Amino acid sequence: DTCGSGYNVDQRRTNSGCKAGNGDRHFCGCDRTGVVECKGGKWTEVQDCGSSSCKGTSNGGATC
């Protein structure tokens, strides 16, 4: 569910599978600028950051 070694630990690829334990956490989507959350087993964008950047941590808590 990560985006590869070139990406930060706070990023997840939108629509990729996620672990159930991450369901209440928010990461930065690496396909586009937005916040993703685990919904229905996949990382789903819940907030579009638009022209703003997304900031996050390795254990979730991402915000625009």
UniProtKB/Swiss-Prot annotation:
Disulfide bonds: C3-C30, C18-C38, C28-C54, C49-C64
Pfam families: Bubble
GO CC terms of this entry: extracellular region
Gene3D superfamilies assigned: 2.30.130.50
Major localization listed first in the record, in broad terms: secreted
Keyword rRNA processing included in the entry's annotation: no
Subcellular location, record wording: Secreted
Keywords: Disulfide bond, Secreted
Superkingdom to which the source organism belongs: Eukaryota
InterPro entries linked to this entry: Bubble (IPR015308), Bubble_sf (IPR036334)
Function: May act as a toxin. May recognize a molecule or part of a molecule with a negatively charged surface potential.
Record-given protein name: Bubble protein
Species name: Penicillium brevicompactum
